[in-house]
């Protein structure tokens, strides 16, 4: 007990440590969910390219803008969390991220509503714009996640143990990202509408893939798979 940094708590030591690990676990779960609703969009991108012909260049610009917004958001929300309860900011961020994901899934429907068509350049350009807005909004709301954790955890962890226990907490990044890849990969491979027997759909997918740099032979091979799960990315 000589090296026990919590010995001064006396009879409250055990209770404090129980709550310490609860706080670590809850914030880990919360931040893992942030990553889950962040990385899922990346899994949807290949399906969107196949169905609508959105290029890697367009995705690249959207991701670039979103990354800048994410960094700005962490800075701004760090200031906010010093003045507002961290758990409120974190809960609000998760809710807003979920809403932006919901809007992302309806991007094609909204594009058709605004343009009056469900294909062609006007539809695709509107879809790219709406998708970009929802992804960038998601990235901004992602910035609500880390600042509350950075404020809350040092209150519960002694400085001599902070690096070790924060290393455990940092596993939340990997957990959230891994769950997103597994869950969304399953959805992309099992959900959606089977249009693999529709020659027009298959030919459109082949055209979209080859226009995005995929080899013709590979595009033909992949087209049937994508056509069998049309709209799976919306989930």
Question: For each predicted feature, which ranges?
Answer:
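Extracytoplasmic
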Residues: 22-56
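Helix-to-loop junctions at the C-terminal end of transmembrane segments
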Residues: 73-85
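Cytoplasmic helix-loop-helix junction between adjacent transmembrane helices
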Residues: 134-171
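Helix-loop-helix hairpin linking two adjacent transmembrane segments in secondary transporters
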Residues: 169-235
């Amino acid at each position: 007990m000589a090296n026990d940094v919590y010995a001064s708590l006396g009879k409250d030591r055990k209770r404090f440590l129980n709550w310490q690990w609860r706080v670590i676990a809850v914030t880990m779960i919360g931040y893992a969910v942030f990553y889950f609703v962040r990385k899922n969009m990346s899994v949807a991108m290949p399906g969107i390219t196949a169905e609508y012909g959105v290029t890697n260049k367009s995705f690249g610009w959207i991701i670039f803008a979103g990354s800048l917004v994410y960094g700005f958001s962490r800075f701004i929300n760090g200031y906010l969390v010093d003045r507002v309860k961290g758990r409120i900011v974190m809960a609000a961020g998760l809710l807003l991220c979920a809403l932006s994901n919901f809007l992302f899934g309806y991007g094609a429907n909204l594009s058709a509503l605004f343009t009056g068509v469900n294909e062609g350049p006007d539809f695709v350009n509107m879809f790219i714009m709406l998708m970009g807005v929802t992804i960038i909004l998601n990235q901004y709301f992602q910035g609500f996640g880390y600042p509350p954790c950075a404020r809350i955890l040092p209150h519960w962890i002694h400085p001599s143990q902070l690096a070790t226990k924060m290393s455990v907490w940092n596993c939340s990044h990997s957990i959230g990202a891994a769950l997103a890849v597994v869950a969304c990969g399953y959805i992309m491979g099992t959900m959606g509408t089977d249009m693999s027997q529709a020659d027009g759909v298959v030919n459109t997918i082949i055209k979209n893939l080859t226009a995005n740099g995929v080899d013709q032979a590979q595009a033909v091979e992949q087209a049937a798979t994508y056509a069998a799960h049309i709209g799976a990315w919306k989930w």
